[in-house]
């Protein structure tokens, strides 16, 4: 796992959010993302630890989409944001974020 210092620096635009999971007891949230974040990698996983809150709206004010528009964070109070091309903003408040490429062993789904 590689520490993410600035979510905005990752090439998330047009990547697909496949799955978002929460491990409540551990305070962990993971996002499985399809789309080359690095050359040769098709699937990546963002993993937030020390999670204190999560906001996952799914109203799609701009229309349905599973693609990411942009990422931001960490902002104040450890807030990390992913704006979806649907117009929804997913927000995770956490102490840290890390990225793992090809978490399922290369190639995604």
Each predicted region: which residue ranges?
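Surface-exposed, interaction-prone regions used to assemble/regulate multi-protein complexes
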Residues: 1-109
């Amino acid at each position: 796992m590689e520490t993410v210092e600035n979510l905005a620096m990752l090439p998330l635009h047009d990547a697909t959010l496949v799955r978002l999971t929460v491990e409540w007891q551990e305070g962990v949230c993971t996002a499985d993302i399809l789309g080359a974040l690095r050359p040769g990698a098709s699937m990546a996983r963002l993993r937030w630890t020390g999670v204190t809150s999560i906001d996952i709206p799914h109203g799609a004010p701009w229309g349905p989409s599973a693609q990411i528009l942009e990422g931001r964070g960490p902002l104040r109070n450890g807030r990390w944001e992913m704006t979806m091309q649907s117009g929804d903003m997913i927000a995770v408040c956490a102490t840290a974020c890390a990225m793992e490429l090809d978490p399922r062993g290369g190639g995604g789904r």
